[in-house]
């Protein structure tokens, strides 16, 4: 039979979660979690694929006292930081199964896992200097279709930055490095989001051929 619910091209919403720095002064991927907020927009190509634009705002922190590595400069006076981070990311998301209510696209599932990857920009406001750099976001997530227009999302994303100074310190080992991601700082985000779907596609395009 014909599908009853329309598919939607666009989503807009917001989310909350945590942000964690991973670098020279924190070796634990889940250590020193800080609160974060997000704005989210999506363009849905079809029930499998979409493009997401997100803006995140949060904090990153770390300390040389919390790692086992010996840093000559901080042997007597440990270094610590607490910086503000803002980023913008454009990522491609691929759902493992078609996403929808099941009444908009034949075979669609309300709950689907997905993978994501893309490009982003990161700005960090430090105590002594600010850093602006690119990042490469890679992650996994899941979406749940509450109803025709309301969506819940959960995503865990790793952001591989091109800078070693998100923490305010460059080369604390006194060892020069080379390569695009060699000894650079990273951060991760875990976000729960709510989005609203709008801009319906033509219903007749959603029928099974």
What residue ranges belong to the model's regions?
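Outer-membrane beta-barrel domain signature
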Residues: 18, 24, 37-38, 43, ...
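Predominantly the C-terminal beta-signal and adjacent terminal strand-loop region
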Residues: 85, 147-209
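Short glycine/proline- and aromatic-enriched beta-strand/turn motifs that initiate or cap beta-hairpins
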Residues: 2-44, 191-201
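Gram-negative (and chloroplast) outer-membrane scaffold detector with strong preference
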Residues: 47-128, 196
């Amino acid at each position: 039979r014909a599908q009853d619910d329309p598919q939607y091209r666009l989503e807009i919403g917001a989310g909350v979660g945590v942000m964690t720095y991973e670098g020279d002064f924190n070796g634990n991927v889940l250590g020193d979690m800080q609160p974060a907020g997000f704005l989210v927009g999506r363009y849905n190509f079809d029930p499998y694929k979409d493009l997401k634009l997100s803006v995140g705002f949060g904090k990153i922190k770390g300390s040389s006292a919390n790692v086992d590595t010996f840093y000559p400069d901080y042997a007597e006076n440990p270094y610590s930081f607490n910086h503000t981070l803002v980023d913008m990311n454009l990522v491609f998301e691929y759902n493992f199964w078609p996403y929808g209510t099941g009444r908009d696209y034949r075979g669609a599932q309300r709950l689907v896992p997905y993978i994501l990857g893309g490009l982003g920009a990161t700005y960090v406001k430090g105590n002594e200097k600010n850093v602006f750099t690119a990042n490469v976001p890679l992650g996994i997530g899941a979406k749940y279709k509450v109803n025709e227009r309301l969506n819940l999302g959960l995503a865990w994303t790793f952001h591989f930055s091109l800078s070693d100074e998100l923490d305010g310190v460059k080369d604390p080992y006194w060892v020069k490095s080379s390569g695009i991601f060699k000894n650079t700082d990273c951060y991760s985000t875990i976000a729960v989001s709510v989005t609203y779907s709008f801009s319906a596609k033509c219903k007749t395009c959603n029928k099974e051929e």
